[in-house]
UniProtKB/Swiss-Prot annotation:
<keyword id="KW-0143">Chaperone</keyword>
<feature type="modified residue" description="Deamidated glutamine; partial">
    <location>
        <position position="50"/>
    </location>
</feature>
<dbReference type="GO" id="GO:0042026">
    <property type="term" value="P:protein refolding"/>
</dbReference>
<dbReference type="InterPro" id="IPR008978">
    <property type="entry name" value="HSP20-like_chaperone"/>
</dbReference>
<comment type="subunit">
    <text>Heteromer composed of three CRYAA and one CRYAB subunits. Zinc coordination is achieved at least by His-100, Glu-102 and His-107. His-100 and Glu-102 come from the same molecule within the oligomer, while His-107 residue is provided by another molecule. Inter-subunit bridging via zinc ions enhances stability, which is crucial as there is no protein turn over in the lens. Can also form homodimers and homotetramers (dimers of dimers) which serve as the building blocks of homooligomers. Part of a complex required for lens intermediate filament formation composed of BFSP1, BFSP2 and CRYAA.</text>
</comment>
<dbReference type="GO" id="GO:0009408">
    <property type="term" value="P:response to heat"/>
</dbReference>
<keyword id="KW-0597">Phosphoprotein</keyword>
<dbReference type="InterPro" id="IPR002068">
    <property type="entry name" value="A-crystallin/Hsp20_dom"/>
</dbReference>
<dbReference type="GO" id="GO:0005737">
    <property type="term" value="C:cytoplasm"/>
</dbReference>
<dbReference type="InterPro" id="IPR055269">
    <property type="entry name" value="Alpha-crystallin/HSP_16"/>
</dbReference>
<feature type="modified residue" description="N6-acetyllysine">
    <location>
        <position position="99"/>
    </location>
</feature>
<dbReference type="GO" id="GO:0051082">
    <property type="term" value="F:unfolded protein binding"/>
</dbReference>
<feature type="binding site">
    <location>
        <position position="100"/>
    </location>
    <ligand>
        <name>Zn(2+) 1</name>
    </ligand>
</feature>
<dbReference type="Pfam" id="PF00011">
    <property type="entry name" value="HSP20"/>
</dbReference>
<dbReference type="GO" id="GO:0005634">
    <property type="term" value="C:nucleus"/>
</dbReference>
<dbReference type="InterPro" id="IPR001436">
    <property type="entry name" value="Alpha-crystallin/sHSP_animal"/>
</dbReference>
<keyword id="KW-0273">Eye lens protein</keyword>
Length: 173
């Protein structure tokens, strides 16, 4: 059986026939009644509409900025501590991996893991890369851009994640 995967912006009123929030990255967060019976929300109240952007904004989408002077990655990792995160540079890629062991929360036991990989622009100074985690759970990976004649340095190295006590200055999408 073929199942069409729809982007959340294009959800239709035929909710039971399309994927719901259950398949999104909301692991460990509570379920709503429309997650289990999505057709109820439109039949009980014709004025109720689920936010079209909620699943997109809350799904851990990263933001990558590359301007003339620097390269920056913002990634929401609010469920992870610096000890749970590993940031490595492998040649011209940065790999961010987060994993925490099973722990108890309000809804039972939960464990989380993610892996993201981004290509670094060739003009990024790999010797000056830094990574920090803000108090509100925003991981910021950044590096300055320089003249393109630099040696890339070692083919693999770890970038330590430092903790900041202030909230992130990254714009909320």
């Amino acid at each position: 059986m073929d199942v069409t995967i729809q982007h959340p912006w294009f959800k239709r009123a035929l909710g039971p026939f399309y994927p719901s929030r259950l398949l999104d990255q909301f692991f460990g967060e509570g379920l709503f009644e429309y997650d289990l019976l999505p057709f109820l929300s439109s039949t009980i109240s014709p004025y109720y509409r689920q936010s079209l952007f909620r699943t997109v904004l809350d799904s851990g989408i990263s933001e990558v900025r590359s301007d003339r002077d620097k390269f920056v990655i913002f990634l929401d990792v609010k469920h992870f501590s610096p000890e749970d995160l590993t940031v490595k540079v492998l040649e011209d890629f940065v790999e961010i991996h987060g994993k925490h062991s099973e722990r108890q929360d309000d809804h039972g036991y939960i464990s989380r893991e993610f892996h993201r990989r981004y290509r670094l622009p060739p003009s990024v100074d790999q010797a000056a890369l830094s990574c920090s985690l803000s108090a509100d759970g925003m991981l910021t990976f950044s590096g300055p851009k320089v003249a393109s004649g630099l040696d890339a340095g070692p083919s693999e190295r770890a970038i330590p994640v430092s903790r900041e006590e202030k909230p992130s200055s990254a714009p909320s999408s």
